[in-house]
């Protein structure tokens, strides 16, 4: 379980995060939505100990990520391409990830087979460094890397960005299947409301760092309330 209490972050005069209380249960797929500047990425960065809060606490299964690294073994995340090692090819990158986690090359290859449809023949065997891939293919490498270790907590910031429509739909299946197979908790942020509604079991709406709505989403039940809030069709 993720527990957030009185979490605050401010940049100058701008309040980026002011969450009084939020609990995310094991096995949920939580979608974070909100307009630009809502604080979604800021929250994720604090969850991953990439950004220090001004006040308050975050705990992952009772562990404060700022005080212990025990949470890292069961967490996979992709925020942006700074998470990648861009002077490697995708093959070299995943071989490196396998090596530091004690996996044989055969085990690495077997894990990557699960993502063949998502990779869609555009990542591997291209003889390209990651830095020379398109934005969409970099995104795929990052998402696959986040899932590669079979983590129990997955955090993805705007995972549908840069992906073509086919890849977006495949990714929805990748994430929901992963959740069903492993029971992992998945957190995503997205400006794509329909995709968020399609895969999330719960949707939290942030505006200016504050939780405005926290909605259960059973078979798309949050759709109408989100439509009314954003005054647009999703």
Regions found by a protein language model. Give the residues of each.
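The feature captures the beta-strand-to-loop junction immediately N-terminal to the Walker
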Residues: 33-35
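H-loop/switch region of ABC-family ATPase nucleotide-binding domains
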Residues: 189-191
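Catalytic Walker B motif of ABC-type/P-loop ATPase nucleotide-binding domains
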Residues: 154-158
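Helix-to-loop junction immediately C-terminal to a conserved catalytic motif
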Residues: 48
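Conserved ABC ATPase signature
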Residues: 129-133
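Conserved ABC transporter NBD signature motif
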Residues: 56-71, 213
């Amino acid at each position: 379980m993720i527990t957030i209490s009185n979490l605050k972050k401010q940049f100058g005069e701008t309040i980026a995060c002011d969450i009084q209380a939020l609990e995310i249960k094991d096995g949920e797929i939580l979608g974070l939505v909100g307009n630009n500047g809502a604080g979604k990425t800021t929250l994720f960065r604090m969850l991953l100990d990439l950004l220090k809060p001004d006040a308050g606490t975050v705990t992952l299964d009772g562990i404060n990520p700022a005080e212990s690294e025990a949470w890292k073994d069961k967490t996979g995340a992709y925020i942006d391409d700074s998470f990648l090692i861009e002077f490697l090819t995708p093959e070299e990158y995943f071989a490196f990830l396998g090596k530091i986690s004690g996996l044989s090359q055969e085990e690495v290859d077997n894990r990557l087979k699960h993502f063949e449809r998502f990779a869609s023949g555009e990542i591997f065997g291209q003889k390209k460094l990651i830095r020379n891939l398109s934005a969409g293919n970099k995104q795929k490498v990052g998402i696959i890397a986040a899932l590669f270790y079979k983590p129990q907590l997955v955090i993805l910031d705007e995972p549908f960005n840069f992906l073509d429509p086919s890849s977006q739909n495949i990714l929805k299946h990748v994430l929901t299947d992963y959740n069903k197979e492993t029971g992992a908790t998945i957190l995503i942020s997205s400006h794509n409301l329909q995709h968020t509604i399609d895969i999330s079991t719960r949707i939290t709406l942030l505006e200016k760092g504050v939780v405005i709505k926290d909605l259960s989403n059973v078979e798309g039940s949050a759709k109408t309330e989100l439509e009314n809030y954003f005054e647009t069709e999703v």
